Amino acid sequence: MNQHEITERRPLLDASGNLTEPGYAKSLLPVYRRGDINANKLRIKEWDYYCINNGHFALALTIADNSYMGLDSISLLNLDQGWEITKSPMKAFTNGKVCLPESSERGDVHSAGRNYSILFKNEGDRRVLIAQMKNFGPEGSLYAKVTLTDIPAESMVIATPFDKDKHFYYNQKINCMRAEGTVTYGYHNRTYTFDPADSFAVLDWGRGVWTYKNTWYWGSASGLVDGERFGFNIGYGFGNTSAASENMLFYKGRAHKLSQVIFHIPGDGGRATPDYMRPWTFTSDDGRFEMDYTPVLDRASCSDVGLIKSDQHQVFGVFNGRAVLDDGTVLNVKDLPGFAEKVINKW
């Protein structure tokens, strides 16, 4: 599979609103400007998503502006006890009013509504995530403050065109950020503490013009292998990926490009409903990513409102297997916490 690397800084879009150079990079070399988009403005989708995980519990925060609707989301997941709570307030016709930054490297993001607020502060060498929501769950309110540090020098960046003219997805995934902070939930102030020694975060930064109907597979993990920070991003399912895949390993702050990775979910692809809680496997065309996956918790969600539908299975669990770096070094991965998902959207 071809893997074209973008190595020069240039505008993401040309005068027509199409990608100037499809492919991948290890930093935000393509320059995104919302004003360069030359498509139906209601098809623009922008989001910042953070997930912090230590294998015992996880916190996920989203601020999204999908033009015809905005979505803010807070998820608390107890992986040891097997429960999760997700609340996702929506707003109508945000149309860029959320003012998500045109780069992940600078700018704060804030969104608030009735009885909640979410703030992502970008302080350069660290990021501070603050979220609060009254009546978050049956036990009461939630307050979270988490600081992310040790931001790696390299990340997964990809510019993917759709076959439809002027449609594209520009995406960055920053793995392996160290996380420190707490989540307090409920009347009894139950506290979940993220220790930077074993707690890591990923940022999913996405900007694009999407088609109406699509499916994606995405997997992400961050943790330690032999005492060193290691993680990966894997995924596929939408757009024209002939220029590059989004599959990448991260080790000691550096990115190592993979070719094609396939998700093997029990029952997926047939007429039967996939069994997301049975063990999965992952294979690669170049033999550099071979994993077994043990699910722990399926954060399942299905919303169907008229023409808008989203069927999501974000499955948290642990990865075991082997990964091979660019120089041939083999890393043996044991009980690495992460998640893998299949999402079907009509949006």
Identify the residue ranges that each predicted region occupies:
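Structured soluble/peripheral alpha/beta segments that form catalytic or ligand/cofactor-binding pockets
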Residues: M1-W347
